[in-house]
Design a protein with these regions (language model features):
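Contiguous mixed-secondary-structure segments that line small-molecule binding/active-site clefts
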Residues: 21-22, 26-29, 34-35, 39-136
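Acidic helix-start/capping segments at beta-turn-to-alpha-helix junctions
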Residues: 11-24
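Surface-exposed patches in mature extracellular/periplasmic domains of secreted proteins
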Residues: 8-14, 38-40
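Signal peptide-proximal N-terminal region
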Residues: 1-9
Length: 136
């Protein structure tokens, strides 16, 4: 449609080629697949700055604010340098909206987070919740 047939896309779902979501970046980097469409937050082990190119839980009021981040002077250059260091290029963001934080018990205030167990990607938000007493 957009390429006049010169570009062919074959989609693979649910880690069917590469294994875990965190491994997709490496698979694209090494040529096993041609493209990665996972969250940059999975790559915080390589460089903590990937957190800001990905999911910043609670960092924005709406997805458009994250898009606006790249318009800030120097931001696109910083993101390009981050990805280029690993032989990759960010060609666009897929931002589905706010991440939800759901619980089987009420969390009315910050002290209620103590000993709260939940699944979270590694990086900034896990460190923040840990500092508040949670167990990500």
């Amino acid at each position: 449609m957009f390429s006049g047939g010169s570009l062919k896309v074959e989609m693979f779902y649910s880690s069917s080629v590469t294994g875990k979501s965190a491994e997709v970046f490496n698979s694209a980097q090494t040529g096993i697949i041609d493209c990665d469409m996972t969250g940059a937050g999975y790559q915080t082990g390589k460089n903590a700055a990937f957190q800001f190119a990905g999911d910043v839980m609670g960092g924005y009021d709406n997805p458009y604010q994250q898009y606006d981040f790249l318009k800030f002077p120097g931001a696109q250059d910083a993101v390009d340098a981050l990805y280029n260091k690993y032989g990759m290029t960010l060609i666009g963001w897929w931002i589905p909206g706010h991440e939800s934080l759901i619980s089987s018990k009420p969390i009315p205030d910050v002290p209620s987070i103590k000993d709260f167990k939940f699944r979270s990607p590694p990086g900034m938000e896990s460190m923040i919740f840990s500092a508040l007493g949670a167990k990500p």
